[in-house]
Curated annotation (Swiss-Prot):
Heme binds at H125, Y129. Coiled coil: none annotated. Residues 29-141 are periplasmic. GO terms for biological process: cytochrome complex assembly. Disulfide bonds: none annotated. InterPro entries: CcmE, CcmE-like_sf, NA-bd_OB-fold. GO terms for molecular function: heme binding; metal ion binding. The gene is ccmE. This is Cytochrome c-type biogenesis protein CcmE.
């Protein structure tokens, strides 16, 4: 084989390997590209299949937070800027910043009835967040 032909084969194989690696990376990461689904997006796309773990996010609707099982299980509604809502149930200790009207991202699965069962809650806050313990210090000086 001539040197030029060998170089072309080597270049072709290298290019094919790079394309294959890029395709594998794209397909592996495309599910993780969306940080969370809002109620509006889930209403448009439909609910994911039962048992598939997803993240849903939005705001905790004021007045929707209730407790059951002696306070062990909480239920609340996640809203966004659309008429769509998601009912979430969570059994565990909520983050300190979790409250009605605040942003939340919940990780979990949908039940056959369409309720979202969260295994993890993340409370979102704005960039101006300051712990309660430091607020008196700021006021004093």
């Amino acid at each position: 084989m001539r040197a030029r032909t060998r170089r072309l084969y080597t270049f072709g194989i290298a290019a094919a390997l790079i394309v294959a690696a890029a395709a594998l990376a794209f397909f592996a990461l495309r599910e993780n590209a969306n940080l969370f689904y809002t109620p509006e997006v889930l209403a448009e796309k439909g609910l994911p299949r039962e048992g598939r773990e997803v993240k849903v996010g939005g705001w905790v609707e004021p007045g929707s937070l209730t407790y059951a099982d002696g306070g062990a299980t909480m239920r609340f509604t996640v809203i966004d800027n659309s008429p769509s809502t998601i009912t979430v149930s969570f059994n565990g200790v909520a983050p300190d910043l979790f409250r009605e009207g605040q942003g939340v991202v919940a990780t979990g699965t949908f039940t056959p009835e369409g309720e979202f069962t969260a295994r993890q809650l993340l409370a979102k806050h704005d960039e101006n967040y300051q712990p309660r313990e430091l607020k008196p210090l700021e006021a004093g000086g």
